C-alpha cells in the first residue's frame, strides 16, 4: 500500500516545490536533537512603539504600564502574508499524497492573500485559477495578476455568511452562472462540462456559496481545490508550526506563550483555531482573542462576527474573548506603525 502511494507521487514536482517554496517557509525538520522549526519569521518587540502610538494617536498614557507587546512579522514570508503557511502545507500534502501532478490546475475561492500565496505554484508549471469578488481592492487584483494567476471575478461576496438561502433570486443566479461559463471558456475550460452541472451550480449561486462552487468546479474539471475553509491542514499549520514557532522564540527571550494573550482577526479561522489548540494542548489555557470589524465594514479578507458564525473553524468556546473593533479607529494606528517601518496590514491594525 505504501509502495503504491509512493509511486503515485510526482517526484519531480515534489522536488521543485521543496526547493523553490517549502525551503523558504516555516516548517518542521527533524535532526539528531528532534523536530525543530526552520525559517521562522521575526517576532519583534513593539512595546515602545505601541505605547508611543497610544499616547500620540489615542491620548492614552501607558508609560507606567507593564504591558509587553510583540508583533509576528509574517510579511517577511514569500508573497508577504500569513496565508503562505496554510497554502504551503496544503499543497505540500497534496503533492505528497498524489492529489496534484505537474501541469494540473489549482482552483480556489479567495479574498486575496491565500490566492496570492497559491500564485507561487505558477513557477512550477501549475495553473492557478482564483474566484474573487469584484469588490476587491485594485491592489489585490494587481498582485494576483503579477503572480500569473487566472482570475474569475464575480459580482458576489466571496466571504458571505454561510447558508444565505434566498438572498439571491434565480435570475441573478442564472446571470452569474452565464458570466462564470463565459470566463471559464475564455480560460479554455470545456463549457459543456459546466453545462452538465448547471443545476447544481445555480443552486450554489442562489445561496452565494462561492466556497462550495470552487469545490464543485475543481471536481468536474479534475482540478485541485485547497478548500481552505474546510481543510484541517489550515488549522494544523498554525497548531503545529506557528504556535510552536512563537513559543520557541519567546523561550529564547526567557518567556513563554503561556504568559501572553494572542490577538488575531478571523478570515477562515485557521490562525485562531490552530493557536487556540496549541495553547490548550500545551498549557491547558485559553489565550486567543478574536477581533471582528462591525457589520457593514469591509476589511480585506476579514469576516464580521455574523459572517464567521456557521463556518467550520469558528469555535468561540476555544477563545479567551471576542470583540468588535471599529476599523475607522484602527486606521490611524495602521498609519503610525507603517510610518515607523513596520510592514503591517489592515487585519493587524484591527
Residue ranges and their predicted role:
Residues 1-350:
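PLP-dependent amino-acid enzyme catalytic core
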